[in-house]
Amino acid sequence: MNAAVVRRTQEALGKVIRRPPLTEKLLNKPPFRYLHDIITEVIRITGFMKGLYTDAEMKSDNVKDKDAKISFLQKAIDVVMMVSGEPLAAKPARIVAGHEPERTNELLQLIGKCCLSKLSSDEAVKRVLAGEKGDSRGRVLRTSKAQEPDNKSVKEEESRTQKEEKRSSEVKERSSSAEHKQKEELKEDSKPREKERDKEKAKEADRDRHREPDRDRNRDGEREKARARAKQDRDRNNKDRDRETERDRDRDRRSDGGKEKERQKDRDRDKGKDRERRKSKNGEHTRDPDREKSRDADKSEKKADISVGASKSSTLKASKRRSKNSLEGRKEDNISAKILDSIVSGLNDEPDQETTAPEIDDNSASLWRENAEPEPAVKQKGDSPSDAEGEAVPTSQDKLEVTENAEVSNELPSSLRRIPRPGSARPAPPRVKRQESTETLAGDRSGSGKTVSTVIIDSQNSDNEDDEQFVVEAAPQLSEIAEIEMVPSGDLEDEEKHGGLVKKILETKKDYEKLQQSPKPGEKERSLIFESAWKKEKDIVSKEIEKLRVSIQTLCKSALPLGKIMDYIQEDVDAMQNELQLWHSENRQHAEALSKEQSITDSAVEPLKAELSELEQQIKDQQDKICAVKANILKNEEKIQKMVHSINLSSRR
């Protein structure tokens, strides 16, 4: 924008108001709050446009909507055009949007000119409040509703003038008759005229009375319509915002769901990899019978997948039929007890792996149908596959591994379930059957079945969902060690061949027993000293944190009023700078005037000073003369005294 326009605005309005400061930055792109402050300051100082705005509109906090801002500026533009009579091309909508700063400056310049010329704005304010609007060419327009009664009044006035003209013509025609007839006729005509005029005046008064409420109603109707439109626009905007927020939430939920699915898949993949690693490790240590067991386990897993799928579908149907208020704890206990009984009986009675797996699955499926609670049992049994996989020696543990792996496969997605051996895979190594190993394994079933049951009980009672990721190298929990103590140690130690997991559990049990031994008295004292020192440090740290919290709170409390003060500092500094410049200019002017006066007085005093010096010289001369005369007088007196003295002496002689 041109700097000359800003300069003109500063010159026009700077003589009227001092606040807000008329800086180039604000005038180059004036915001609505700045214009509102200028107009309210003009009204407060000069009284121009007084009564145009209500008390609520005079406060900028109440004028925040776009429609309110536009109406505020439109009133000011109409009044300025009516008072000045000059056209204004400024549009309030463009001004509110921050466009057309030059036209905005023209409006401010016209306001300043009207205030400097002291033009009255009372009539213009009344007309604007009545609904009239100023044309961009400087003419006055009225609203369509306000024009209708005015058009009626114009027509009525025209009809009155026509009637009066007709009457005057009749009077002129009758004037040709005698004078006395004229007087009588004039008297007779004047009476009905006066009556008609009185009637017309009364009618006009009634019409005006009727017009005023109609105008008020029209204004109220327009205001209500504008408010209703604004409300509708706000409602639409709010609905659009709500829709957008809902869409964003749906997108976030979808993205979160996708992320959770990906995380679950990653976890499942990691579990599968860990299991494969453990199996590969155990496979290296075991012999050919273990390979045969793994093959048989694969076959049994296929069967178990089919049976568990049927059991799961039946349990889902049963869970929908049953009510949610049933006692879940008792049912879970019944489920765990029945499953344990069925597993132990299957381990002790049936030697073949292929026959035990489907029977256990059938028992478990029937139990699920009776109790209709599938999820807790699945979670409880989901902890034991890692334990069963760690043990590669007894056949009973392999049976457990079959059933538990089948149940875990239901929890995993279909893509991550154990896939049967494909047809394109290389042929399996030849099986070498040894009767001695099978006999020893069959003999070991009675001893190892009990240990497996204890492990299953522990997995059922554990509530930690992360136990599915059990690693062989990690130490077991205290609850597991306590239950292992319940098992007779003689049965475990007598067996020569134990699984890797049982050995690890025994080692951790021994370590735990060593840790359980009573500590030394010196260690107790050290621990007490460390605890007391730790408590002191904790108290000191908590006190420091409390002090820091209090200081932060006080800082925040003082920062808010300080920030409010800082908003007004710029305005105050600008005003003080302007005032300082004004006083500096006045000081310069007075100094120049003083120097001029001093030069004038000096020029006027110089001849007087010369005269004064001359008079002083004359005074000195006269004083010298007086002194000389006095000296002569004294000399003469001495002479006289001598002469008198000599005369006295001579007379005495």
UniProtKB/Swiss-Prot annotation:
Q: What highest taxon heads this organism's lineage?
A: Eukaryota
Where does the record place the region DISC1-interaction domain? 229-653
Q: Which UniProt keywords apply?
A: Cell projection, Cilium, Cilium biogenesis/degradation, Coiled coil, Cytoplasm, Cytoskeleton, Phosphoprotein
Please state where this protein is localized. Answer: Cytoplasm, Cytoskeleton; Cell projection, Cilium; Cytoplasm, Cytoskeleton, Cilium axoneme; Cytoplasm, Cytoskeleton, Cilium basal body
**GO biological processes:** cilium assembly; defense response to virus; embryonic camera-type eye development; embryonic digit morphogenesis; embryonic heart tube development; intraciliary transport; kidney development; morphogenesis of a polarized epithelium
Pfam families listed in its UniProt record: MIP-T3 (PF10243), MIP-T3_C (PF17749)
Mark out the compositionally biased spans (Polar residues). Answer: 448-462
Q: Which stretches does the entry tag as region Disordered? A: 134-467
Q: Which residues carry this modification: Phosphoserine?
A: 437
Q: Does the keyword Coiled coil apply?
A: yes
- Coiled-coil ranges per the record? 533-628
Q: Example GO molecular function term?
A: microtubule binding
Region Abolishes microtubules binding when missing: what ranges? 1-306
Q: Where is the composition biased (Basic and acidic residues)?
A: 145-305, 325-335, 370-384
Q: Does the keyword Metal-binding apply?
A: no
According to its record, what are the GO cellular component terms?
Answer: axoneme; centrosome; ciliary basal body; ciliary base; ciliary tip; ciliary transition zone; cilium; intraciliary transport particle B
Q: How does it assemble?
A: Component of the IFT complex B, at least composed of IFT20, IFT22, IFT25, IFT27, IFT46, IFT52, TRAF3IP1/IFT54, IFT57, IFT74, IFT80, IFT81, and IFT88. Interacts with IFT88. Interacts with IL13RA1. Binds to microtubules, TRAF3 and DISC1. Interacts with MAP4.
- Please give the function described in this protein's UniProt entry: Plays an inhibitory role on IL13 signaling by binding to IL13RA1. Involved in suppression of IL13-induced STAT6 phosphorylation, transcriptional activity and DNA-binding. Recruits TRAF3 and DISC1 to the microtubules. Involved in kidney development and epithelial morphogenesis. Involved in the regulation of microtubule cytoskeleton organization. Is a negative regulator of microtubule stability, acting through the control of MAP4 levels. Involved in ciliogenesis.
Family stated for the protein in its record: Belongs to the TRAF3IP1 family.
Q: What is this protein called?
A: TRAF3-interacting protein 1
From which source organism is this entry?
Rattus norvegicus (Rat)
Which taxonomic lineage is given here? Eukaryota, Metazoa, Chordata, Craniata, Vertebrata
Q: Which gene encodes it?
A: Traf3ip1
